[in-house]
């Protein structure tokens, strides 16, 4: 009788190992995070730059004003503002104005007592408007002005275009006629609004004083005179100073023993002003009509070329990064925001050294291998797959996963850009609130506000880096699920994102996995391990199947009992419950 014995023999193969993971880099960079401190990453996007000083320029896409009157040669802005005869010309519109006179220059005309009024701020006031023009008509008729009749005085120290005697076009130096040279009580003149609707009217006026002899000769009164101006609820009082002046002139012209005090008042649309005066008045004539706003920044001339940003300390800047370090100062245009320290955004993955196959001995001495670290050679992406086997090492990037990581970084960049815009708007709003003060006073930067914004931006970058680095686990987990689904029953999961395949997986195989086109059948893969069935013929020696099975089961049972007894004895000996002596 023949019996068939089925012997099951599992056919093993030299399996390859496929793992998910992240690229490695030999040149790690460092970024700061909110909770992990400094972290090495494979790439960064620098967010800050440190500018170098350059010349000032015209702001790109914006009308930029250097001098109030570009075609008025050898004239200061104060000359133009007061209407010096040789400094009359076109004053173009501008959205941005350069305060190029660190200390506003004097006027090349009659000597002015600058320290008694804010007249040096008049050019700054005009720079603060987008549109400025000098009226064609006079605001006050000198022939009918109270305290007259008058004749209009001129001076050799203020020559006109023909080099004859002249005076400022914004004022009329009214001197009583010979039959009217006598002291008068204060008289009042109304200053009407003559500009167009929507324009502010800047009215310039003043008074003249000299020594007693000249005061008596010119006005018939050598005593100090009183003057008052009032507009928009602002009232200013003056008393003239008599004598004590050395002969001098502002620039060129004839030296003078007298002085003039010049002031201005701003009249809002439709509002009138008043001036109360005695002898020596300089009555308003042509007025400035101004509208719109022009941002003012300290700088220097000439303006060369164009720039994205005008910065008080660095001049014209072209924006290459959203933030900058260095000196903090006022800036206008498409400018980076000041931050205290350099900032970098992670543009890659957390740095890992090149991967090594680590081996650990497990149960019954079996060796389990897994990868630790990052991969070298994956230049097409950040996340992907690697296989190890007889073919060596193959690496392939998963472009979709890499793109998702890049999208997250782009999202963070967009967020930081939005934060930049919001902070710029906040700064702009604060500057607008101070606009009226800025027109009259040199602007001071709010350093506390800048420090606060810098801290907010730095925190936002730290949190962004934290999110980018932490999202790696999400990408790897998604990659592992994708790989497991593609491999199906053709591989066994061995942990750490690795799978042991039941087939070879070279570079071609790995590329298809990365592309999502992997098909197990293309690599001669059976559905499961093959079984070899071997038939054995036994001679009929009187043993039937039942007898054979009985012998086998008896032997197996005896062996099992023997092993159990041996294990029990070893256990008891180890617990000192049984002693064993061997005698020879």
From Swiss-Prot:
Q: Which cysteines are joined by disulfide bonds?
A: 19-498, 75-87, 109-158, 505-509
Q: How is it modified after translation?
A: Palmitoylated.
User: Could you list which ranges are Extracellular topological domains?
Assistant: 16-552
GO CC terms on record? host cell plasma membrane; membrane; viral envelope; virion membrane
**Is RNA-binding included in the keywords of this UniProt record?**
no
Q: Which SUPFAM superfamilies match?
A: Influenza hemagglutinin (stalk), Viral protein domain
The membrane-topology field of this record reads: Single-pass type I membrane protein
Record-annotated site: Cleavage: 361-362
Q: Where would you find the membrane-spanning parts of this chain?
A: 553-573
Q: Taxonomically, which superkingdom?
A: Viruses
Q: Name one GO molecular function term.
A: host cell surface receptor binding
Q: Where is the signal peptide?
A: 1-15
| Cytoplasmic-side segments | 574-584
Task performed by this protein: Binds to sialic acid-containing receptors on the cell surface, bringing about the attachment of the virus particle to the cell. Plays a major role in the determination of host range restriction and virulence. Class I viral fusion protein. Responsible for penetration of the virus into the cell cytoplasm by mediating the fusion of the membrane of the endocytosed virus particle with the endosomal membrane. Low pH in endosomes induce an irreversible conformational change in HA2, releasing the fusion hydrophobic peptide. Several trimers are required to form a competent fusion pore.
An additional note in the Swiss-Prot or TrEMBL entry is: Major glycoprotein, comprises over 80% of the envelope proteins present in virus particle. The extent of infection into host organism is determined by HA. Influenza viruses bud from the apical surface of polarized epithelial cells (e.g. bronchial epithelial cells) into lumen of lungs and are therefore usually pneumotropic. The reason is that HA is cleaved by tryptase clara which is restricted to lungs. However, HAs of H5 and H7 pantropic avian viruses subtypes can be cleaved by furin and subtilisin-type enzymes, allowing the virus to grow in other organs than lungs.
What does the annotation say about its assembly with partners? Homotrimer of disulfide-linked HA1-HA2.
Its recorded name reads Hemagglutinin
Q: Specify the taxonomic lineage.
A: Viruses, Riboviria, Orthornavirae, Negarnaviricota, Polyploviricotina
